[in-house]
């Protein structure tokens, strides 16, 4: 299944759906009212590769801050709204490029209608978000527990509320911390709607556990052609979310750009600090936009052969190492110059 015929939705100056590239999202963890701190974090996220950013808007002060934040950043700004419809309206009036709501907790139909009216007037897309943790009691009872079917029915019910108000500039997100339930729900929802989907595993956990859950869940979903935007939700620095999202997309062949670093797991032949060297290489190449593979190998015995699928690599040895290109040894390099030699080669890559 490849959902290249999903509805096209414009978010600020970005476009999703209709076969457009999958965009990477994150969410700030600053107080939105603190414009300086929020902008500072968003600019870091932009530099890491974030393409859409969401901020919580729990107060009118936070809604007002959106205007100044919007002026100082370069990616679409999404307002995350819970419970109070007035926050959604205020956020849109202050420049939000999209709002995220759950019509089920905004209040009466009149309140939802008031939000939709402003969105319609300004042509601002609404992301309808449903989480398994807040599934309605009647759906839990209907399906004898929290299930993929219940999550999908809840989401489509909420979408129907907005459609009945004459608006269809929508994105849907359905999330669960149960990875396989989340996958099943997306498979089911993708068969029932052409709206673009924002995909993520909610409450995934810390950097280690969250990355594993997100890689498995997002990998299974995206590999089926499902998903138009993604977020890797981690308990930690949001910049780590962007790094992980980029790697997931690149691993699936859905995104090019950025150096892929591969390294051997080390063995008794290793005579250098390969773990430290591999980490240094990963850090060193973050600002280099080449679309190539770099190998970091632990010894000169198997290093060249194992690195032949990489475009370039280094293999460590006691006192000296090797510079390798496509599995062929190019030259020997003093151990303390391996990193600098590799960086110089990368910076001059493609030059005659």
What are these regions (language model features)?
Residues 60-81, 114-126, 186-197, 281-283:
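Alpha-helix-loop-beta-strand connector modules within alpha/beta enzyme cores
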Residues 86-127:
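Hydrophobic or amphipathic alpha-helical targeting/insertion segments
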Residues 19-37, 56, 75-83, 139-152, ...:
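Active-site mouth loops of central-metabolism enzymes
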Residues 29, 35, 46-69, 100-108, ...:
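Glycine-rich, proline-tolerant flexible connector loops at the mouths of alpha/beta enzymes
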Residues 1-27, 120, 283:
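N-terminal amphipathic alpha-helix/helix-capping segment at the start of soluble metabolic enzymes
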Residues 131, 139-285:
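Catalytic alpha/beta core domains of metabolic enzymes, predominantly
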Residues 22-28, 53-55, 77-81, 99-101, ...:
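Hydrophobic faces of well-ordered beta-strands that scaffold small-molecule active sites
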Residues 73-75, 92-99, 120-123, 190-196, ...:
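Glycine-enriched alpha-helix->loop->beta-strand junction motifs that scaffold or abut catalytic
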């Amino acid at each position: 299944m490849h959902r290249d015929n999903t509805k096209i939705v414009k978010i600020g100056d970005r476009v999703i759906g209709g076969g457009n590239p999958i965009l990477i999202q994150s969410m700030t963890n600053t107080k939105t009212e603190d414009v300086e701190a929020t902008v500072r974090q968003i600019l870091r996220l932009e530099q890491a590769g974030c393409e859409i950013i969401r901020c919580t808007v729990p107060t009118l002060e936070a809604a007002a801050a959106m205007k100044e934040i919007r002026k100082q950043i370069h990616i679409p700004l999404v307002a995350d709204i819970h419970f109070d419809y007035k926050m959604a309206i205020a956020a849109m009036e202050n420049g939000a490029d999209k709002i995220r709501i759950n019509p089920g907790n905004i209040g009466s139909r009149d309140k939802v209608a008031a939000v939709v009216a402003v969105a319609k007037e300004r042509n601002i897309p609404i992301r309808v978000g449903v989480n398994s943790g807040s599934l309605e009691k009647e759906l839990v009872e209907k399906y004898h527990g929290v299930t993929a079917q219940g999550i999908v029915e809840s989401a489509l019910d909420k979408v129907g509320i907005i459609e009945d108000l004459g608006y269809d500039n929508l994105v849907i997100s359905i999330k669960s911390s149960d990875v396989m339930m989340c996958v099943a729900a997306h498979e089911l929802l993708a068969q029932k709607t052409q709206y673009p989907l924002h995909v993520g595993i909610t409450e995934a956990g810390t950097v280690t556990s969250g990355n594993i859950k997100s890689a498995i869940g997002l990998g299974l979903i995206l590999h089926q052609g499902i998903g138009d935007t993604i977020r890797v939700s981690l308990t930690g620095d949001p910049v780590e979310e962007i790094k992980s999202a980029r790697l997931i997309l690149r691993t699936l062949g859905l995104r090019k750009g950025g150096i892929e670093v591969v390294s051997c797991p080390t063995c008794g032949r290793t005579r250098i600090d390969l773990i430290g060297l591999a980490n240094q290489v990963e850090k060193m190449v973050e600002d280099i936009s080449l679309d190539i593979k770099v190998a970091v190998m632990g010894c000169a015995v198997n290093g060249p052969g194992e690195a032949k699928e990489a475009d370039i690599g280094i293999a460590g040895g006691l006192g000296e190492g090797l510079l390798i290109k496509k599995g062929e040894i190019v030259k020997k390099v003093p151990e303390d110059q391996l990193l600098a030699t590799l960086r110089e080669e990368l910076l001059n890559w493609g030059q005659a």
